[in-house]
Each structure stands twice: as structure tokens, then as C-alpha cells.
Amino acid sequence: MVETKFKRNAGILMPVSSLPSPYGIGTFGKDAYDFVAFVKECNHKYWQVLPLGPTTYGDSPYQSYSAFAGNPYFVDLDMLIEEGFLLKSEVIARDWGDGVVPVNVSEDDAINGRFGTYRDGNIGDDRYVSYEKVYNNRFDILRIAYNRFKAACIESKKTLAKGLPLYKQFDNFVKDNADWLEDYALFMALKSYFNNVSWGEWETDIKFRKPEAMRHYEEQLSDDIGYWKFIQFEFYRQWTALKKYANDNGIEIIGDIPIYMGYDSVDVWANQGEFQLDENLTPIKVAGVPPDAFSDAGQKWGNPLYDYEKMEANDFSWWRKRMKASARLYDVIRIDHFIGIVKYYTIPADMPDARQGEYRQGPGQKLLDAINESIGDKKIIAEDLGVEVPEVAKILKDNGYPGMKVLEFAFGGDRKNPHLPYNYTQNLVCYGGTHDNETLLGFFENRGDWELGYAYDYLDTRDKIGRASCRERV
């Protein structure tokens, strides 16, 4: 048994996308720094974020184009304005989803908050993200920033941190991250070139990564490739500064990584031999979970499954790189659907649902040994919710990983419910709710009288329920 790396403490789960922002979605800007200050003021230790990768259709952070790249939506536009790559007036002239857009605003008025005349668009709600409007505007505005960035590099007049010339900082970033950035930037440029269809529908030669086709598109799409590299340069620079600020204030960042990649991702396209694909590069088996009390058909997620035999033959090289990259981004790494490392559910890709699936043994400790070697002293949280797999408890104990409990699940059963705090064992992380739950306020607004009564009696309070539930978690 390995001793846990955690000490008793508390934190807050706050998706970056949910931070306040005038530009449609939360970013790494001022409000993120204010949130760090809030976490510190609460005497908490941790800020947990959802996966930071670029999202695909459906906008779920658990379906990403890359295990290594960052979400362009989180690049703060005000910081780009400060750097001289954007004008305030051209940023606020976009409809980011609240339905109110200034028109005919000078740059001076924009900077000083004097917006003058407004027009009403399709009235939105600033409590929610309008992903359609963010998508339609964010990439265009980042393209403007990229063009000014290129001009600044050519002129070699602008400098950033420590006086290092801008082009040199960018070149260093590209060089240091070449093992994933080159494929990612080409992949995204190709996505745009082929009208955003899945890579499985691209022209045959580039789909199969034939060397001549790779060279052809690298040359033809060189400017687009530079654009996608620039976005990652800004993402990583802004996130690194924010994380340093958090760490300097005693706050650690808990990151979240999905166990599986989506089929339409650069990781599958660039590592075709390490996934269960047929000769046409179509998934043979896909991920999901079996039928249970909540679903007669189970859940067919559709993610291509890893070919763990080939991965092991390569010393789990992709996993090592992935976890090493995650260790640079985060102080603690939460692995979603951790059970899948020990035992995974496999479904024939041509089946309509998960009823025809079966369990297969995962790599277990072999993969975890590679992960532990890759992340050094960084900590791991294992999301072990759902189907109980006896082998998981031993794996967690052997590695010192804490599992999870969810307080919102605690009051719907009897006294043996494992999510009730008095049934907790040592070395676990208790969440009020996860990204799959409603908010704590929503929980108390939407539960029936019996479940609420149980919660009130257990927490011994009715008028300060939020504070009491937080007390139980810590």
C-alpha cells in the first residue's frame, strides 16, 4: 500500500467556461484571477476545472480534438487587447450571446466604457453560454489577432515577459511542444480545409497520413497551421501565468482528463495503430457502459477503444506523454472513468446500443506504473463512480489514489448508502456534486419531501443547508 499524498482540505469545482465574461464564455482573464482570490478568501486549497481541451460538436469538454491542446475559447481577449493584437472596439462590436451589441463606437470610447449607441440582436441570456455565437465570433477575432501577431514578429519590435522578442518566445514554444503541436495544428487546418468533416472522411492519402500528402498539405496550409499554433501559444502562456498566480496564493489546480478520446481527434488520426480500428480506419469496438437500473440499453459513448497490447509494446508512450503534459498543466489530475483502466466495457461499433457489449480486462497496474513514472510527485484522483469493480479498490489502495463520493447521491437510499459521510473510509474525495449533477441549490429545489427530509435531518439544519453540506464534505 502506498501512503496518500493528500491532506484533509477543501476546494471548489468551477469550470473556466462558467466564469463571468463580457465575451460569451469564461476565460483566463481578470475574472479567473478574482476567482482565485475568492478561493483563497474561503480558506480553501483547491480549484478544480473541467477538461481544458478544445471541444468538438456538442461542446462537451469530455469530447476533445486533442489530449494536449487547449480550448481557444479560454484565451482572454482583453489580454490580447493589452498586447496590441486586438482593438477593444472590434471585440465589443461582436454579438457574444447577450443580444446587445454596441455600434459606431470609437476605440477611445470602447477603452473607456463609453459605448454610446446599441442595437438589439437576438436577445440572449448572459447566464448561459451561446456556443453558436462564441463559435461564430471567437475564431474570426483570433484570426485578426494572429495577423497582427505575424506583423509584430516581422517587425521584431514587440516584446513580452523578460524582454524576450515575441518571435523568439513563439519559436521556443513551438519547438518545446513539437511532439504534439505539429500534428494538432495540421489536423485543425485540415479540418477547416475539408469543411470540418471527420478525418475519417478526408481524402484517402491524408487520411492514412501518407508522407507525400502530409508534405503537400503542410506547405499548402502553412498559414492556417501557424494560426493554430499561435492560439496554443496564447492559451499556454495565459494558463501558465494564471496557474502560477494560483500557486503563489496557496491554491492548487485540480485538472480533469477523460479516459477516452473521441474518434474525430488528432490523437486517433496521428496514432492509428494504437486504437481498435479496421483496415479502413473505422472503429471496430467502442466504449460505453452496460445496462443498469437507469438505462435498459446502457450507454454507447462511441469512443474508439485503445489497443492496449500495442500500447504496452510501445511502453505506453502515448499515455506517458499525455500524463506528463497534464502534470505541467495541473497540480492534481482527476482521471475520469478510472474503472476503464482496470476493466473496460467494449461494444461492437455497429450495434445501436450497449446491450451487446462485454467487459475486457484493462492494463491495470502496468499502465499505472507508466503513469506514476511520468507525473513525478503530482497527485491523482480516481473517479471510480458507477459500476463496482472489486479490483479497483485494491488498485486504489496499492497506489494511494483517493476515490470519490458524491453528497447529492447520499440521501436517496438507506443508512448503508456509501455516499453518506458516516460511511466514508479514509483517503477519498467528497464532492457536493460533479459536472454530471445539478448545482447544490438545484438539488435542494428539485428533490422530493422524503429525500429532502432525510438530508435536513442528517445535516441537522434547515435554514443554513448550504453551509451544513459543505461542512459534511470537509
Name the predicted role of every residue range.
Residues L50, E252-I254, P258, V332, ...:
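Outer-envelope exported proteins of Gram-negative bacteria
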